[in-house]
Amino acid sequence: MTRTVNCRKYNQELPGLERPPFPGQKGEDIYNNISRQAWDDWQKHQTMLINERRLNMMNAEDRKFLQGEMDKFFSGEDYAKAEGYVPPSE
């Protein structure tokens, strides 16, 4: 049986993650309030930010920036986007 959560990002009941994505309170919050779909969307966006902004995950400031953008992404605030990116039209 698939576990569902009331997704903070999409404001609907959706399948949740199988386990917290990382340890601690932040991981538990994501596990309990973020859907699999929202997490997958964040992973794609995070990869784009790391590549386009040339973020170095060994750098504490870059990790802090990415953490802040993740919080904005999930809460519905305006978050950083890759400059010049145009999503493909369907």
Swiss-Prot record:
Which Gene3D superfamilies does the protein's record reference?
A: Fe(II) trafficking protein YggX
A Pfam entry, by short name: Iron_traffic
The Gene Ontology terms for molecular function here are: iron ion binding
Entry's InterPro entries?
A: Fe_traffick_prot_YggX (IPR007457), Fe_traffick_prot_YggX_sf (IPR036766)
Keywords assigned by UniProt, alphabetized: Iron
Which GO terms of type biological process are on file? cellular response to oxidative stress
Q: What SUPFAM superfamilies does the record point to?
A: YggX-like
Q: What is this protein called?
A: Probable Fe(2+)-trafficking protein
